[in-house]
Amino acid sequence: MFGKLLTKVFGSRNDRTLKGLQKIVISINALEADYEKLTDEALKAKTAEFRERLAAGASLDSIMAEAFATVREASKRVFDMRHFDVQLLGGMVLDSNRIAEMRTGEGKTLTATLPAYLNALTGKGVHVITVNDYLARRDAENNRPLFEFLGLTVGINVAGLGQHEKKAAYNADITYGTNNEFGFDYLRDNMAFSPQERVQRPLHYALIDEVDSILIDEARTPLIISGAAEDSSELYIKINTLIPNLIRQDKEDTEEYVGEGDYSIDEKAKQVHFTERGQEKVENLLIERGMLAEGDSLYSAANISLLHHVNAALRAHTLFERDVDYIVQDNEVIIVDEHTGRTMPGRRWSEGLHQAVEAKEGVHIQNENQTLASITFQNYFRQYEKLAGMTGTADTEAFEFQHIYGLDTVVVPTNRPMVRKDMADLVYLTADEKYQAIIKDIKDCRERGQPVLVGTVSIEQSELLARLMVQEKIPHEVLNAKFHEREAEIVAQAGRTGSVTIATNMAGRGTDIVLGGNWNMEIDELDNPTAEQKAKIKADWQIRHDEVVAAGGLHILGTERHESRRIDNQLRGRAGRQGDAGSSRFYLSMEDSLMRIFASDRVSGMMKKLGMEEGEAIEHPWVSRAIENAQRKVEARNFDIRKQLLEFDDVANDQRQVVYAQRNELMDAESIEDTIQNIQDDVIGAVIDQYIPPQSVEELWDIPGLEQRLHQEFMLKLPIQEWLDKEDDLHEESLRERIITAWGDAYKAKEEMVGAQVLRQFEKAVMLQTLDGLWKEHLAAMDHLRQGIHLRGYAQKNPKQEYKRESFELFQQLLNTLKHDVISVLSKVQVQAQSDVEEMEARRREEDAKIQRDYQHAAAESLVGSSDEHEAVTAQAPMIRDGEKVGRNDPCPCGSGRKYKQCHGKLS
């Protein structure tokens, strides 16, 4: 109450921010008359003038008003479009490390030209990031004439470009591209073997379109570059045949309740668990098929790989549904993005889940992959010196943007008042009743010529509605992941009189729905249209536009509430653009996922009390509030998962930054001779310490062992025992120095034989290759550690602290192994000539060619340890169990005091 009172008196933080920026808008508008008088040449010359002022020490803020005025005037001349004042406000928000929430149709693409131009003047590069290749190409080509008029270069960074094309794109003043490509290029640059192979410049300014989609929806998806691991497709096929024998149980076993099913599903957490009965049944089935030894347990260390496959198969059959979570196309399983409804070719689920789904669908099973490099979008984008974003719906996620990325959200007012009518939800008891009501609403809209956009949450639902419309003879277009090729065309005409378009979730986002249809697209379809043809198309469009406005504008019809309010708002936001008429309504049923899982008891009770009959709907603020509270719960849970994932990934990120920085230093250095010298002293010294403990008596020295080790690992054949026998005054310190000097002399001789330049090149190649190999193994070890770390909670230990401690130990181990392996390789290898270095480089390139770029959808549960699955601890080689098999009711060996089945035995 007091908060509302204070806001009324002082205005909200958003109001105060906009008020401060409004003063700069006045300054920009004051320059307009003078800039209109400038010739084209004088206007173009402004770019060089601004660059000179920046070079002389001026700040971007000091030239902002003039730069924005320049872009506005150039836009009027090139596009015949003038930036509105609200677009100037949006541009200033984007320049100040903030997120601008701008409604659909307010011209975000044109707004982005303002901060992009201003920040490009520094010469450090601007990255404008979109969600797909189509939007990246479209925005780059649309804005290219404006930027080139002002003397700036524009690059496009999309999939399929060669190294030289990529380099050219990054060297442009402004580079448009997708988040995937920028992230993958960063990883590839950090796997390069020479500075010439790198394509990116230091990360300066990123301007993200649809920022909520990229920084929030995609935040749980790490970008992964991977290489193929061993083939285990046969095992997936065999285990796939077991799952249909299992029976689902309504709820989990407890002390009071023991069911008769084999597994239970937790729909809230999106997890599946075996019951005790199910575990025994699976073990018996595996024994029958000869995949498990008689009397052996699925949970013994030797069978962890088998357990991993069983868990993956169970999840594939119970949690992942065809035409909802994925589609099968051209004998391939392709993931469908749950947030946008788009397909994601080339992206694969990790931890063997994708292979399990392939086995379930009977398509070709691709090999599992080994991670070579990975990063989350969260950690990639936090590396930019300046970061900003724009979207139509950011306010619901403002806390997360601030908490994770340090970005404030500013809601930019619309240019014209919003007149869309958002009607209350209608809730039905069954899905059939809901669909009947939807069809009736669509028919009513068509009768009055009002276009309808029907939003669905899955491909399956969109196809069901399409079948119902065919039965009712309602002409319609379907826009889902299966028909994305026609996406822009379908969306462009979705505003025509009486048209009906079914769209999966937010498919078609980024393309405006114009009332009456898109007349620009009609003109583009003609070859060299005449002025008369253009005028006729525009006149016809105006008639259609007026008809649609009179009918009530675009009607948005939601068939189900999404887990996130933001996605619902995005669907609503397709109507009412730029002050257009429009309306929206959501139709729900008690059988919808969100209602069934989160709101069912309360709302069902309410509906029963009201004595509802078949086909009758409830429309009440209480119901809407209950649904919104359910959505808030899901949003809070998803935020916690992303936050927890980031906390874990931050540990890996610190190590990644160190390794990549060291790697770049190595690559850029002319010579790493001094580094090799320092490492050599450490490595040889550490080996000597193992056989001659520091400050120890001679009786404790193991000289034969030291001689053998130096010869085996460093090709040093030294008569150490002879030295000691002949020289009484040879003590520990001087012996140490003599051994290290002997290695140095042997290495010097090698250098004289092959030449200093060849050896310097070879040192660098060995160091980089060894580091890459060890880093790859380290990533696998970190994955295994992270995915099993939640089990430490059973031993009353903090999993996060344990993860930090153990990952640091692994990293120390990596550095020590790196030093040792580099010196060992340099000691043993006989470099004959320059050709040896070239051959090594050729082999490395061959390996590179085998690497496939992969997106792996890491299940958030396994990443942060909220799942009880232990599929993560997949062994690289079979492990032999020593000691007796632990019974399920025996005390757990970890010492927690619990039964084994309730502690470390509770793996699924």
UniProtKB/Swiss-Prot annotation:
Biased composition (Basic residues): 898-908
Enzyme category, top tier: translocase
Cofactor mode of binding and number, as noted: May bind 1 zinc ion per subunit.
Catalysed reactions, semicolon-separated: ATP + H2O + cellular proteinSide 1 = ADP + phosphate + cellular proteinSide 2
Pfam assignment, any one: P-loop_SecA
Description of how the protein assembles with itself and partners: Monomer and homodimer. Part of the essential Sec protein translocation apparatus which comprises SecA, SecYEG and auxiliary proteins SecDF-YajC and YidC.
NCBIfam families the UniProt entry points to: PRK12904.1, secA
Protein name: Protein translocase subunit SecA
Source taxonomy: Bacteria, Pseudomonadati, Pseudomonadota, Gammaproteobacteria, Alteromonadales
Gene encoding the protein: secA
